Amino acid sequence: MRGLLSLIGFSALLSAAVVLDRIAVIAGNHVIKASDIDRDIRLTDFLNRAQLNFNASAKRESAERLIAQQIIRDEIVSGGYRRPPESEAAQLEAQLLRDRFGGSQERLRQDLERYRLTQAELREQLLWQITVLQFINQRFQGGIVVTDEDARSYYDQHTADLKREYPKDSSFDALEPKIRSSLEGERINQSFNEWLDQARKSERVEFKQGAFAEKGVQ
């Protein structure tokens, strides 16, 4: 009898785990679980220094982020794009530790505990952010052209703002490299967003009913 009760108890635990980690979204050939959404919300709110929010809207936004991540991952694999080394995530983590926590590992650990995150999960998220930025540059930078006319037009339209921002030398010659870099960055981001929007529209996505119910902060 005791063995039977133990089996029943174990089965109940397994059932609870299945409910907790139910499939939330099917995107193409990929499955996004409830635990993936939970972790993404915790990481996003931690990095944004925001209060944890698990309402239906936050879960839906998280699901869309994770769908986009899968699209990008598929493109990285199919396109053979180079991935950054893990050491770059360690460098970004060190910068976060210095700028936000005054170099205190204990303060970082306590904040991670408050969001129920591990340092390994944080580092993985930082590595992913670097991966996305590197992919965007590799994939879209090559087709971007900023002409002399583009740079001059931007300068003429924003002269007053540029003079306030760079009072020592706001001449066109001095600011042209910054203007070109800014315009290039804007156009790279625009090309990336247009590509991602189109890819998202082409993706077969199924949201599972009941997976986005609001829950309290845990």
Language-model features and meaning:
Residues 1, 16-18:
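Absolute protein N-terminus
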Residues 3-13:
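Sec-dependent N-terminal signal peptides
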Residues 18-26, 32, 53-218:
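Peptidyl-prolyl cis-trans isomerase
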